[in-house]
A protein has these predicted regions:
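Outer-membrane beta-barrel translocator/pore domains, especially the C-terminal barrels
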Residues: 1-300
């Protein structure tokens, strides 16, 4: 059996747009409103990837970033084939300090070919045309939100949706909640956080729970259709000149199969990192808004 798998999958994309601006007011505050027509085309040829193990890759929840994404999956185990064109109109409200207060987008995606790469439990793309809606912005100084809807125009039904909120009350503090839905595939809730426990100790965690799951890759509880599909727990200790991280992560790799890697790391500020696994990568991927404790000191 081969001990190393390699893939070479080319991707060609074309992104074009224009930006128009005008003075506006939002909730009584002066802002600059933009109007941004945009065209995004991506082509990735199909390649059978069934010989590549599926570890931590899943279908991304639909939001603004997915409007102009080349790969519909999160993770490196699958590269989606694509031959599609997205036409969108984006409007932003930008405050005087440069912060984006509100973002609205509407678009339509044309599939020239039906995507053939799919993971277990993922429903096939049934429509050549999808209506895309997205909204995001700042609710207050510490609260932000992001949301998106993908509507199947041909079938007159909702294909996927996503809504997330984030609370960032201060430095090294982030709490996230997200709901993701895809028709005939999944309905998940994700909760994640980075938060100080004491002056030097910080906790990191994530829980991803399937409220309803379909297909071989997720359905393991036929009585309720629900299950825990991913969890992460981690601790960090910050000293004057070093940081120690440790954690464990559990996720579903296939039907009835789970993986639980354990990792730890000692980082000497500005010098090097020693340990088992890569907790920094896991924390960054699992917790939106995660901040490295010694950020700004220097990266080894």
């Amino acid at each position: 059996k081969p001990t190393k798998l390699t893939r070479t999958i080319p991707t060609v994309s074309f992104d074009s747009g224009m930006v128009f601006e005008r003075d506006a007011s939002l909730f009584g505050k002066s802002t600059t409103q933009t109007l941004e027509p945009r065209l995004f085309y991506v082509y990735t040829p199909y390649e059978n990837q069934d010989d590549v193990p599926l570890f931590d890759t899943g279908r991304s929840g639909f939001n603004y970033a997915q409007l102009f994404s080349e790969n519909r999956y999160v993770g490196l185990d699958r590269v989606s084939d694509a031959n599609q064109l997205t036409a969108a109109l984006v409007s932003r409200f930008i405050q005087e300090d440069g912060a984006e207060r509100l973002r609205l987008a509407i678009g339509q995606r044309l599939y020239f070919e039906e995507p053939r790469v799919r993971i277990a439990g993922e429903a096939a793309q049934q429509s050549r045309y999808d209506l895309l809606l997205a909204a995001g912005g700042t609710i207050s100084e510490s609260w932000t939100f992001d949301s998106g809807v993908q509507y199947d125009a041909a079938g007159s039904s909702l294909y996927s949706s996503n809504v997330s909120v984030q609370w960032r009350p201060g430095k090294m503090k982030a709490v996230n909640a997200e709901y993701r839905y895809q028709r005939d595939s999944f309905r998940n809730i994700d909760l994640s956080a980075q938060y100080p426990i004491s002056r030097r100790w910080y906790g990191v965690g994530r829980v991803s729970y399937a409220l309803r799951s379909y297909g071989v890759g997720q359905a393991v509880n036929p009585s309720t259709g629900s299950k825990l599909i991913e969890s992460l727990i981690g601790l960090e200790y910050q000293a004057d000149c070093w940081v120690f991280r440790m954690g464990a992560q559990r996720f579903v790799t296939a039907a009835q199969t789970t993986s639980t890697p354990i990792f730890f790391q000692l980082e000497l500020n500005g010098l090097s990192r020693l340990g088992l696994g890569n907790p920094l990568e896991s924390f960054n991927k699992s917790v939106p808004g995660y901040t490295r404790l010694n950020a700004g000191i220097g990266r080894p």
